[in-house]
Amino acid sequence: MTESESASGMDGVVLGGTASGVGKTVATLAVARALADAGHDVQPAKAGPDFIDPSHHEPVVGTPSRSLDPWLSGTDGMRRTYHQGDGDVCVVEGMMGLYDGSVASTARVASELDLPVVLVVDASAGMQSVAATALGFQAYAAEASVDVDVAGVLAQRAHGGRHADGIRDALPDSLTYFGRVPPRDDLDVPDRHLGLHMGSEAAIDDDAVDAAAAHVAAKRIADVARTPPRPPAHDPAPDTGQTVAVADDAAFCFAYPATRERLRERADVVTFSPVAGDDLPACDGVYLPGGYPELHTDALADAPALDTLGARAADGLPVLGECGGLMALAESLTTTDGDTAEMAGVLPADVRMQDRYQALDHVELRATGDTLTAGSGATLRGHEFHYSAATVASDARFAFAVERGDGIDGDHDGLTEYRTLGTYAHVHPESTAFDAFLDAL
């Protein structure tokens, strides 16, 4: 749906948590299902840069989830991304606790979109204390100097009967009871490094989501939802007439829907699966998103696509790889078990998986010269989260100096060779990085 097509606006709410691990993802699925059952066309979204939680939204709602992050895309870009959604109500899953995060908290997302917050509170061992917690979160907005409307509570892991009644009765008039999510083992999502399993790998049981949705007050949530402000008009960039090959499989699954949309707006997009044995299609440029190449090293080592990619890159084909894409473009990738597999061999680095994450933050990069995604001196904002470390050759060339974050070696990001660029940073299309990439084809 284009901005003009959604001129009537899309109401929305933000599900903010009291802390990480409180059950926001499951609560989001329950609310989305309840609203859909009530006749609404639901657009899911995620506050922040995460790729994994949104993968659980689409199987339940049937619509790709939008990523809303003011650091990655700016306020106008975030509002534009929101209004490019497709539905009459948007359910935005928050990240971490409501006020947590120095540059892109859930509270900031809610404030800049002017959306009310439904506070997800773990009610497994409390009743009146749930109300006290919610009241504290409501009052803290003034202390944090952020304009956040905490509208009420969704009680996570709450039983019915006296438990639910006690929570509801304890809430002051300023806080609405929006229902509960019952404690059920089949609502748990298994996790691993980088977070939960992807929705395509470990989808939450659909009957369990239905059971949880039955206890959500969908009408109350729809009644408090409201429409964010619109950004200034934005003229789309012209079609390049070029073809971009995008890797799309379990090893390369971290791509924002907005990124795929921007690529399709300005180029012909062909997808391929290196893991499944697809060769690199005929194309004018390649995008390798992040994902889990470390879980598919054998398949990638045998993939004809990586051999072809190495040869085409050496001939000057523009190639952009982010995080997992960077790893696949390296000389080798070693798992935590010590197994080493050859990769495409385009970038002068050997990558090894670590037991602990090596970087997790929003980042800011400054281009030290003209590169695929930015002109010399330009800055890009992104996000990094990875468990791998790259050992680079002494003559390796970097495209970016790190102003915030860790990058590849603490000071630099963006290994570059030929017309290939590999970064640990993930960027959003509103950063202009993908437009620069397309213009370079």
UniProtKB/Swiss-Prot annotation:
Recorded GO MF terms: ATP binding; cobyrinic acid a,c-diamide synthase activity
Q: What class of enzyme is it?
A: ligase
Q: Annotated pathway, please?
A: Cofactor biosynthesis; adenosylcobalamin biosynthesis; cob(II)yrinate a,c-diamide from sirohydrochlorin (anaerobic route): step 10/10
Q: What is this protein called?
A: Cobyrinate a,c-diamide synthase
Role of this protein: Catalyzes the ATP-dependent amidation of the two carboxylate groups at positions a and c of cobyrinate, using either L-glutamine or ammonia as the nitrogen source.
**Which reaction(s) does the protein catalyse, per the Swiss-Prot or TrEMBL entry?**
cob(II)yrinate + 2 L-glutamine + 2 ATP + 2 H2O = cob(II)yrinate a,c diamide + 2 L-glutamate + 2 ADP + 2 phosphate + 2 H(+)
Q: Where is the signal peptide?
A: none
Please name the GO terms of the biological process aspect recorded for this protein, alphabetically: cobalamin biosynthetic process
Q: What is its EC number?
A: 6.3.5.11
Cite the GATase cobBQ-type domain residue spans from the record.
243-434
Q: What is known of its domains?
A: Comprises of two domains. The C-terminal domain contains the binding site for glutamine and catalyzes the hydrolysis of this substrate to glutamate and ammonia. The N-terminal domain is anticipated to bind ATP and cobyrinate and catalyzes the ultimate synthesis of the diamide product. The ammonia produced via the glutaminase domain is probably translocated to the adjacent domain via a molecular tunnel, where it reacts with an activated intermediate.
InterPro entries reported in the protein's UniProt record: CbiA/CobB_synth (IPR004484), Class_I_gatase-like (IPR029062), CobQ/CobB/MinD/ParA_Nub-bd_dom (IPR002586), GATase_3 (IPR011698), P-loop_NTPase (IPR027417)
A Pfam short name = CbiA
- NCBIfam families membership: cobB (TIGR00379), PRK01077.1 (NF002204), PRK13896.1 (NF010471)
Question: Where does the record place the site Increases nucleophilicity of active site Cys?
Answer: 426
UniProt keyword annotations, A-Z:
ATP-binding, Cobalamin biosynthesis, Glutamine amidotransferase, Ligase, Magnesium, Nucleotide-binding
Comment field (misc) = The a and c carboxylates of cobyrinate are activated for nucleophilic attack via formation of a phosphorylated intermediate by ATP. CbiA catalyzes first the amidation of the c-carboxylate, and then that of the a-carboxylate.
Q: Which residues are responsible for catalysis?
A: 323
Q: Which cofactor does it need?
A: Mg(2+)
User: Which protein family is named in the record?
Assistant: Belongs to the CobB/CbiA family.
Q: Which lineage is the organism of this entry classified under, starting from the top rank?
A: Archaea, Methanobacteriati, Methanobacteriota, Stenosarchaea group, Halobacteria
